[in-house]
A protein has these predicted regions:
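Structural beta-alpha unit
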Residues: 41-44, 52, 68, 75, ...
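A short acidic, glycine-rich active-site loop
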Residues: 58-75
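Gly/Ser-rich helix-loop-strand patches that form or flank binding pockets
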Residues: 16, 112-157
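Small/aliphatic-rich secondary-structure junction motif
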Residues: 1-61, 145, 156-157
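Hydrophobic/aromatic beta-strand patches that form the interior of the parallel beta-sheet core
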Residues: 35-37, 105, 126, 151
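A short helix->loop->beta-strand "cap" motif at the edges of active sites that frequently abuts
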Residues: 32, 86, 148
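Structured loop/turn residues at secondary-structure junctions
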Residues: 11, 107-110, 130-131
């Protein structure tokens, strides 16, 4: 089996830099392209904001605050990704056909549903061990619902 494309969904929790580093190391070993997917929930998806907050000003402040937090989280993930790619000498490229390259994709939605959907477009799924050892929705979607071979890496190397 020749691998061309690896998919790594970033789950929740700590050890973000360690997990990205581990995923990029596996990618470098195989000489493939890796798509790293970071997911965030849109506050409008999980709350009926109009029912939770009465009044337009409070709702707008809530959505602005949530949007600011989402942007800050994306910036942190991007900075870690950039640093780890530079450290390992991997090119950042959105083209899936470039070997020894990586791409970071930020998605908005329910993580387990996005993982199940996008994991079907790769040759290998890479997933990190859930933080508590209990199976999470992201882990289950990556391992059992993708239909692809899977490598599980530790959260800390």
């Amino acid at each position: 089996m020749q691998l061309k494309k690896i998919f790594f969904p970033i789950g929740g929790g700590e050890e973000l830099a360690e997990r990205i580093h581990g995923a990029l190391l596996v990618n470098k070993f195989f000489g493939t392209h890796i798509n790293i997917m970071a997911c965030q929930l849109d506050p409008k998806m999980i709350y009926n904001v109009r029912m939770t907050l009465k009044g337009g000003v409070l709702m707008e402040e809530f959505l602005k605050s949530a949007g600011d937090e989402m942007r800050a989280e994306r910036e942190v993930i991007k900075a870690i990704f950039d640093a780890e790619c530079a450290k390992l000498g991997l090119d950042q490229n959105d083209d899936d056909h470039v070997p020894n390259s990586a791409a970071l994709r930020h998605m908005v939605g329910i993580r387990s549903e996005l993982v199940e959907k996008y994991s079907k477009y790769c040759d290998l799924v890479l997933v990190s061990v859930p933080p508590t050892g209990s199976i999470t929705g992201t882990f289950e979607a990556a391992v059992t619902k993708s239909g692809k071979p899977c490598i599980v890496i530790p959260r800390k190397l």
